[in-house]
Amino acid sequence: MYELLRKSFMASPVIDRNGYPYFVNPISDGVPRVDPALLNEVVEGLIDLGDFDCDVILAPEAMGIPLAVPISLRLGIPYSIVRKRGYGLPGEIIIDRSTGYSSGSLYINGPGRGDRAVIVEDTLSTGGTVRALALALASHGIRLVEVLAVFDKTGDLADAVPGVRVKAMLRVGVRDGKPFLDC
């Protein structure tokens, strides 16, 4: 299952990002270029993995976007981008978050009180981004029903976002500077 994705991940170079081992992959970084067959396998895999019982798909910038767009088109569910910069629009939700290698604010415009949301993410590393999103959404009356990721580096998805279904296509890691699949 997910043969193209597995092959692509295992070929990923690993770089040091301020002491954090970071794998570079077409799906998580857009580098090297994204093969359409690989993207299609990932999109189909996420659609099969998820329930998508939602009003909106949330796509964290940047690499959630190329995943959410084809899912939105295929399922007919609107998507909204979780941006790294704000617009100051009425109702804008501001989230402070920290990941394994960076921190900063995120901004959501679009979903409103009573909406049900699914987050589509390329990689869950520490779960910091999705935990921050879940708290912010809940405080604005938006129910996060599911988080779907291509890669899971957390090792334990059950703890990623308490009370929310979190699923990933592949469990992965980096050991001694090399990527590995944690099946």
Show where each model-derived region lies:
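Active-site-facing substrate-recognition patch
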Residues: 1-53
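PRPP-dependent phosphoribosyltransferase catalytic core
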Residues: 2, 134-183
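Conserved PRPP/pyrophosphate-binding segment of the phosphoribosyltransferase/PRPP-pathway fold
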Residues: 40-94
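Conserved acidic residues
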Residues: 55, 115, 145
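Short, glycine/charge-rich flexible loops or terminal/linker lids adjacent to PRPP-binding catalytic cores
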Residues: 76-118
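Conserved G/P- and acidic residue-centered "switch" motifs that form tight phosphate/ATP-binding loops
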Residues: 122, 127
